[in-house]
Design a protein with these regions (language model features):
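Conserved alpha/beta-hydrolase "acid-adjacent" motif
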Residues: 243-249
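Conserved HGGG/HGGXW glycine-rich cap/lid loop of the alpha/beta-hydrolase fold
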Residues: 7-63
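Conserved hydrolase catalytic core segment
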Residues: 87-126
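Conserved acidic catalytic loop of the alpha/beta-hydrolase fold
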Residues: 72-89
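Short beta-strand/loop motif that positions the catalytic acidic residue
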Residues: 230, 236-238, 242
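Conserved alpha/beta-hydrolase "nucleophile elbow" surrounding the catalytic nucleophile
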Residues: 29-31, 89, 93-95, 239
């Protein structure tokens, strides 16, 4: 569904299938991603609606605006929630989406039954290599994120055709190099590159600048201590193999909240919805069911 608001036109994924008798989960994706991730999250359909996701400005099918900060992203989603008039929401955010969820939960906690942040670190520091890569070479930035954020590849059928197949022109192989819309590179492990295609394509947006804008928004985001402590029913989920977040920083983050539940997801890293959706779905269901 498309919704026109004062802050721009938003695409709200799965809104048309909402059943008032079932629980509502609102998912906010990580940097550079959009509603496509929501379809990889599927809690028990007997209890929960299909996962809602509101594309941030310039992401997915929402129109671009001047929004470039976590606060502005949260304001955009808040306006949409008011327009569609929903409450009793299980709020869930991945990585940067977790920061947006924190801002939302602090601004109007009565709307949310629970808050789940997975693989989200606050404050979220972004290294210079990733900041530079996200602004100059999106594919290079995606390489960095998958190098440190993927522990295992999902089980997929091995392609029967040559490298670069799978029905997409995102990659082409020419003279031993892989050509993408964002640059060229040599690939030592073509099978891994093909296996990662399903994840890397989630970073494709209308503008190449989106990932860079998101990374800078993460770097610049800060909350008042009083606002952090005002967030209720908060749960921190981390992939035990995630090298993109620091366990020490997660512990410090939990201390900031005062009361937060920590759950570790076994055998996955930063992108559990890609690596092993069953692990993520099981963990999220355990969290949500606590507040029903």
């Amino acid at each position: 569904m498309f919704l026109k608001t004062d802050s721009g036109t938003a695409y709200i994924h799965n809104f048309d299938s909402l059943d008032s008798e079932k629980e509502i989960v609102l998912f906010i994706p990580g940097a550079g991603m959009d509603h496509r991730v929501a379809d990889l999250i599927s809690p028990n359909p007997k209890i929960f609606n299909k996962v809602l996701s509101i594309d941030l400005p310039g992401h997915g099918s929402s129109t671009p605006t001047e929004a470039k900060s976590i606060q502005e992203y949260a304001g955009f989603i808040s306006n949409c929630i008011k327009e569609i008039d929903i409450s009793g929401i299980h709020l869930c955010g991945h990585s940067m989406g977790g920061l947006v969820a924190m801002e939302l939960a602090a601004s109007d906690s009565k709307l949310f039954k629970s808050v789940a942040l997975f693989n989200c670190q606050y404050p979220l520091f972004v290294g210079s290599a990733l900041l530079d890569g996200s602004s100059r070479n999106l594919d290079g930035a995606a390489d960095f994120l998958t190098k440190y954020g993927i522990h295992k590849l999902p089980k997929i059928e091995k392609p029967k055709k040559t490298f670069g197949s799978m029905g997409s022109s995102f990659y082409k192989k020419t003279d031993g190099k892989v050509i993408s819309p964002y640059g060229s590179k040599e690939v030592r492990d073509p099978d891994r590159e093909v296996a990662l295609f399903g994840l890397k394509k989630l970073f494709n947006q209308v503008s190449k600048d989106i990932l860079s804008i998101d990374m800078n928004a993460c770097m610049n985001y800060r909350m008042d201590d009083s606002d952090i402590k005002s967030i209720n029913n908060i749960n921190i989920l981390i992939g035990e193999m995630d090298k993109l977040v620091s366990e020490k920083k997660i512990d410090e983050m939990i201390s900031m909240f005062g009361s937060a539940q920590l759950k570790k997801m076994e055998g996955v890293a930063h992108f559990p919805f890609f690596e092993d959706p069953k692990v993520l779905n099981k963990t999220l269901e355990e969290v949500f069911n606590t507040y029903i």
